[in-house]
């Protein structure tokens, strides 16, 4: 969409506000709303100044001025606001140079795509993430000196089979690990997901399917069509915005937290990816699983750098409560055709044009711009250095003998460990100036604060284990 198209859209839809949006390091959308009558063609040249020191992990107060530069191609009407509002995504620029800020996730994603093209390896990267989420009726939590707790409830939860309700307990609900594909009334989220899908399509996403996921208490997934890297990251931010707001409208609360429930599956964000050049899928070939040698090298790069990637693709302390065996979480750094216990799967596809890999360890807490860019950089490093991933593992990796399992590398065991790997293994990210050392240092510092806060927190389970010693 051009600037002229945006200005026409504002006029034709009697738009009252333009909502400028950007994504911070943690992956959360931020915004500022401007009366639409202030928007003209010059606005798309000059941008909007703002205080970058107020964004966690960004600039200090002594150099806080930054520019939000609206991208007219991202303009979309907001279906949730009372007054007609047009959302426009922004890149964050340095005012002195008007170049992308090195800590701006969207600018990093764009640089990753530019770097890929500069290598001559490929001109297009296609990304197809599958974020899962939970819908709850009620969530309470508190952390202070007097105590800590969280309490989740949902009418669909397996623990509510004996709960008394005013209009009676209807009994239909998925059990633990029993939520995959049952029809209503066991699946109580059908209409909510349908409403989400309709709004996602209204906002430009292509929805392929929606369904209940494995876990009890309202785990769900909506599958959307793949897209190029930065555009798909934009779409994931729209996806999350829609899920949160439709859930709210239905009297529910949505979370993309990787592991809100103990004892059932967590939420992942498997990421399908492939490279193309001149319209030809570079991952299709005659090697294992119908892959090309290029695809195998790409896998090799992902596996080699996986533990550093974990700091970005699994960026919360909670992420590592999901990455444990037997909850469909891929902890083994291996690849396989169809085998879902491997961290990288080669899906069955109807034609070579659709050949791709699926990286299964990421989760939806990840900043999509950073996660997709980091995986691309790891894959490109594998191709450039011809890193072969070794033999495929066509067996259930969860049931291997201990000696055999010990020989297979695994994902990082904690966020703290992943950050250490990122600190030591960063050159693949800084190639071509895509990620800067300054960004990586600031990212590690920001996430280390989370680790330190969790490490010193007194956990309720510690009272169960140790109160009576």
Swiss-Prot record:
Its EC number is 6.3.1.2. The activity of this enzyme could be controlled by adenylation under conditions of abundant glutamine. L-glutamate binds at residues 265-266, 322, 328, 340, 360. Keywords: ATP-binding, Cytoplasm, Ligase, Magnesium, Metal-binding, Nucleotide-binding, Phosphoprotein. It is found in: Cytoplasm. SUPFAM superfamilies: Glutamine synthetase, N-terminal domain, Glutamine synthetase/guanido kinase. It holds the Pfam family Gln-synt_N. It catalyses: L-glutamate + NH4(+) + ATP = L-glutamine + ADP + phosphate + H(+). GO terms for cellular component: cytoplasm; membrane. One of its GO terms (molecular function) is metal ion binding. Its cofactor is Mg(2+). Disulfide bonds: none annotated. GO terms for biological process: glutamine biosynthetic process; nitrogen utilization. Oligomer of 12 subunits arranged in the form of two hexameric ring. Catalyzes the ATP-dependent biosynthesis of glutamine from glutamate and ammonia. This is Glutamine synthetase.
């Amino acid at each position: 969409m051009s600037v002229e198209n945006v200005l026409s859209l504002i006029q034709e839809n009697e738009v009252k506000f333009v909502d400028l949006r950007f994504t911070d390091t943690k992956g959360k959308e931020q915004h500022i709303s401007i009366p639409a009558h202030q928007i003209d063609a010059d606005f798309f040249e000059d941008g909007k100044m703002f205080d970058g020191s107020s964004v966690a992990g960004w600039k200090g107060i002594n150099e806080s001025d930054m520019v939000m530069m609206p991208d007219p191609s991202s303009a979309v009407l907001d279906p949730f606001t009372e007054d007609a509002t047009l959302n426009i995504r922004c890149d964050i620029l340095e005012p002195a140079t008007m170049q992308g800020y090195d800590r701006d996730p969207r600018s990093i994603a764009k640089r990753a795509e530019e770097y890929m093209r500069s290598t001559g390896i490929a001109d297009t990267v296609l990304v197809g993430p599958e974020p899962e989420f939970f819908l709850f009726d009620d969530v309470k939590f508190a952390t202070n000196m007097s105590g800590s707790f969280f309490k989740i409830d949902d009418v669909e939860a397996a623990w509510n089979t004996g709960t008394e309700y005013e209009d009676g307990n209807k009994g239909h609900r998925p059990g633990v690990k029993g939520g995959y594909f049952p029809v209503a009334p066991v699946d109580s989220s059908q209409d909510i997901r349908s409403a989400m899908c309709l709004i996602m399509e209204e906002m430009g996403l292509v929805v392929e399917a929606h369904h209940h996921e494995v876990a009890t208490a309202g785990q769900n997934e909506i599958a959307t069509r793949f897209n190029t890297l930065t555009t798909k990251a934009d779409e994931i931010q729209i996806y999350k915005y829609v899920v949160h707001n439709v859930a709210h409208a239905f009297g529910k609360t949505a979370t993309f937290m990787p592991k809100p429930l103990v004892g059932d599956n967590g939420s992942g964000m498997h990421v399908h990816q492939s490279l193309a050049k001149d319209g030809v899928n570079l991952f299709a070939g005659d090697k294992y699983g119908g892959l090309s040698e290029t695809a195998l090298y790409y896998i090799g790069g992902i596996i080699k750098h996986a533990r550093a990637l974990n700091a970005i693709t699994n960026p919360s302390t909670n992420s590592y409560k999901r990455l444990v065996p037997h909850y469909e979480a891929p902890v083994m750094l291996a690849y396989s055709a169809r085998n879902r216990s491997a961290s990288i799967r080669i899906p069955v596809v109807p034609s070579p044009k659709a050949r791709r890999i699926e990286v299964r360890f990421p989760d939806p807490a990840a900043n999509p711009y950073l996660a997709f860019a980091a995986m691309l950089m790891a894959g490109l490093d594998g191709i450039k250095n011809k890193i072969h991933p070794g033999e495929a593992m066509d067996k259930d990796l969860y049931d291997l003998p201990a000696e055999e399992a010990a020989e297979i590398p695994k994902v990082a065991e904690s966020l703290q460990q992943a950050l250490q790997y990122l600190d030591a293994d960063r050159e693949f990210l800084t190639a071509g100036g895509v990620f800067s050392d300054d960004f990586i240092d600031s990212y590690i510092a920001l996430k280390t604060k989370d680790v330190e806060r969790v490490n010193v927190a007194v956990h309720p389970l510690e009272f169960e284990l140790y109160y009576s010693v």
